[in-house]
Swiss-Prot record:
GO BP term (any one): mismatch repair
A GO cellular component entry from the record: mismatch repair complex
Biased composition (Polar residues): 370-381
The family this protein is said to belong to: Belongs to the DNA mismatch repair MutL/HexB family.
Gene3D superfamilies in the record: 3.30.230.10, Histidine kinase-like ATPase, C-terminal domain, MutL, C-terminal domain, regulatory subdomain
Organism: Shewanella sp. (strain MR-4)
UniProt-listed InterPro entries: DNA_mismatch_repair_CS, DNA_mismatch_repair_MutL, DNA_mismatch_S5_2-like, HATPase_C_sf, MutL/Mlh/PMS, MutL/Mlh/Pms-like, MutL_C, MutL_C_regsub
Region (Disordered): 353-399, 420-440
Membrane-spanning ranges: none
Protein name listed in UniProt: DNA mismatch repair protein MutL
Role summary: This protein is involved in the repair of mismatches in DNA. It is required for dam-dependent methyl-directed DNA mismatch repair. May act as a 'molecular matchmaker', a protein that promotes the formation of a stable complex between two or more DNA-binding proteins in an ATP-dependent manner without itself being part of a final effector complex.
Superkingdom classification of source: Bacteria
Record key words, sorted: DNA damage, DNA repair
GO function terms (MF aspect): ATP binding; ATP hydrolysis activity; ATP-dependent DNA damage sensor activity; mismatched DNA binding
Amino acid sequence: MGIQILPPQLANQIAAGEVVERPASVVKELVENSLDAGATRIDIEIDKGGSKLIKIRDNGSGIPKDELALALSRHATSKLHSLDDLEAILSFGFRGEALASISSVSRLTLTSRTAEQTEAWQAYAEGVDMAVKVMPAAHPVGSTIEVVDLFFNTPARRRFLKSDKTEFTHIDEWLKRIALVRGDIHFTLTHNGKTVRNYRPAMNEPQYLQRLTQVAGRQFADEALRVECQHDDLRLSGYLQSPWSTVLTDTHYFYVNGRLVRDRLVNHAVRQAFAQKAEVEQPGYVLMLDIDPHQVDVNVHPAKHEVRFHQSRYVHDYILQALQSALEEAGELGFEHPFEPSSPQVRDEVSLSESGTQTQTEHHAFELQSPESKTHSTWNEASRVDTSRVEISRDSQLTERTRDIASARPYSGVQSNAYGSMAVPRESRSGPTGESRARAELPSKAAIASYGELLQTPSYSVQDKPYQPVLAMPAMLNGQYWVLAQGQNLSLLPIQSVALATRSHEIETKLATGLIGQPLLMPVSIAADTDWPALLEEHETLIRQLGLELTIRYQQLIIKKVPPYLRDSQLAKVIPEWLQSLRFEAPAPNALAVWLAEQSLTGFTSAADIWAAYSQLTEEKRQQIADKAVSLPWQSWLEEQAIE
């Protein structure tokens, strides 16, 4: 048999093998065309699971009479005209083959009218050459497409269809997915003359929560954590199943620029964010990612179920950090079950009493902001650092330490900021009243694990020791020395050396159990030396103990996680220098502590901060530091003056 061009109908039927898998595929393609046409209402009518009839009616812009014949032709589209358009596509359809493929395996009729036309026109294709015939019809502005007897001319494909109930279930499931991302559209779904779904437009948050309840169930909607995070050209929004929920759900929806996709990247990010936090192995989520269309390729799958990100690692880490931030804030509130079932349009308020002040918190769905928008807490009058909405203060009259509502571990009365800076006592903090307070005092294992892995305020293992009040700070000389008086002796203690010794002691204590690494939003890549792979393998335990995550790929060292003490360092310079030192010998714990302390002294913002941290040390350790003070021979000087 020689090479020949296939007849149009046969070519379309072959293409339909990829585009039209089952009735749900037809509904998907036609509804997406309606959305691209700007429709605000779409009515879907199904008969016998879609094998007998699929009818889609919308109020979109319609198709002009002159373009109706082209609409049923292969590779005819209004969505793009050049390669540049394809590289920045935002519409659902763009290949121009759906209508031609569907019409080749069914009896398809397209009726449409634009606002500029006084009458509607109807088109259908028939015959081996798929010739399109156009005739006048009655129809409002918009389009209606009828697909009758799907696969009537391909018996083999028709035999593979499941029961009417199963095929309709696939249609219903797909409509749920599109209804979540297009809350502004009114969808109706009818099967065998009976209205099954009626998704009214959701123009505000309570209405959208009602739609979320219809699609994902009341329990998911009532317990969901709201995710809202933006960084540069990336924006992630949606809802996340509560980590305290034990209910299994099949709500796993991820959208990229409004397009529903299946992506292993987001599944991995969700599982990693929920590691040791969730009661279920695969938590539910409805997440919508908005990204520059130039940074994503949607033309990689025949049915457009998958996309390819140009910077997949960057997107993965962004999603991971956004979800971890959401879980952090939920964990900080300390509720065993932070949501009570309620009407989707009613939000309960929980009154949190802190230092006599009542704070009203809406908890139907927490709106979790990006790290940049979090409020800052006051350490002292001279400094402010981000501590993820947990207020930490120091006053002249320090109150007795109390248990933090987000942790059930013994508490030492000190807290480190996000960059491992000085530790100061925390004021007494009262939790919620009533039943919520009881739950706050006895959080679940998931809540404890969540608190232990906070990104912005990392938790370290703390010894259960009695609280030590802040000592009276001595006088300062030139802002660089403290003047210590011991009996008749005076000495100068360099403030910088106290900061270094205090931080070193803090780090050395925590190195015994290992530091907690924080994921970088943007991993740092450095050209790797040839012997670095061997160094990483040889000192793997030490690297893990420091909270570092280092990998080598394509002769590049990739820094993914660092301890909080290195967050403000020039990682591209500091990490290679440290790796160079490993070539000679592994440093002792005290040397490591000094090195990390030198990198993180910027966390101290004032002498008062340093003295507060110094006051928390044991008396023996304070004495060791004070012994390094330089004595002032002031008595000898006085005697010399008296003689003169």
